[in-house]
Amino acid sequence: MLNRRLLISLLAATLIAQSDGATARAAAIQVDTALSAAVASPERLPAAVARDPVRHPAQELTFFGLAPTQTVVELWPGGGYWTDILGPYLAARGHFYVALAPAGDADEDSLTAKWRTRFTAQPDRYGTIVLTTLGPDKFEIAPPGSADLVLTFRNLHNWMDGGYAPQALAACFRALKPGGIFGVEEHRGRTDRPQDPKAKNGYVRQDYTIALAKQAGFELVGSSEMLANPRDTKDWVDGVWTLPPTLSQGEKDRDRYLAVGEADNFVLKFRKPRH
């Protein structure tokens, strides 16, 4: 069994290699100094920092139009990769809502417990984070018309599996101000196969996502290939969870999956119409 430090080192090396093609696309995005400082903070967890070369957090948030005075909603924060950046960045002048996953799933409950322990106990660093819930029957993620930016990272497949993706996107639409932005990152499904409405393998077709968002009332205003990974064939034994960072197969074929890297992901920017 690889120890934790070695695994992080191997994962970091793999992600750096994976990021070569996407880095050029991300490098063209100019990031403000405060956001760069939040990403570079020594207080972030080493395991999260190790993923930065492939996730391009500062560039992605800049692409979505993040600003320090905004009201921002993060959906289903998981372990807090993005919260650890957004919280300090927004603490002084912004407002930050986090819509947690509903209780009842053991894995999600564990993540939520760890998230609460880390982020609600340090108001000086993370500011006042307003907690709400998204799904399966709770969709008031923030006061209607209050948010400048709503963000979801690799969550849409979960809402599809739960049967409430349309309601989740409608909640995002309601929470945003006219002209507000909805940013979506998700594992990109293959276009040569029909979309599983439950997204059981964790992949969602980009065109399917765009159609869902338009059905909710959004207009597509941008897309980015900064998280593209052409090595991801999307036919893995355990779906997207076969690949890093989950590596669901344990030691079996680990080197192969590390060589592939994290999944191929799309980044889409939607806007709530101004009128």
Can you name each region flagged by the protein language model?
Residues 97, 179-187:
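Conserved beta-strand signature within the Rossmann-like core of class I S-adenosyl-L-methionine
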Residues 90-91, 159-160, 176-177:
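Helix-to-beta-strand junctions that scaffold the AdoMet/dcAdoMet cofactor pocket
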Residues 87, 165-178:
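A short glycine-rich, Lys/Arg-flanked "PGG" loop and its adjoining helix->strand segment in the class I
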Residues 140-150:
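A short acidic, Gly/Pro-enriched loop at the edge of an enzyme's catalytic core
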Residues 68-78:
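Conserved class I S-adenosyl-L-methionine
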Residues 35-63, 67:
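Class I SAM-dependent methyltransferase Rossmann-like catalytic core
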Residues 257-275:
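C-terminal lobe and adjacent flexible extensions of AdoMet/dcAdoMet transferase-like proteins
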Residues 110-138:
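S-adenosyl-L-methionine
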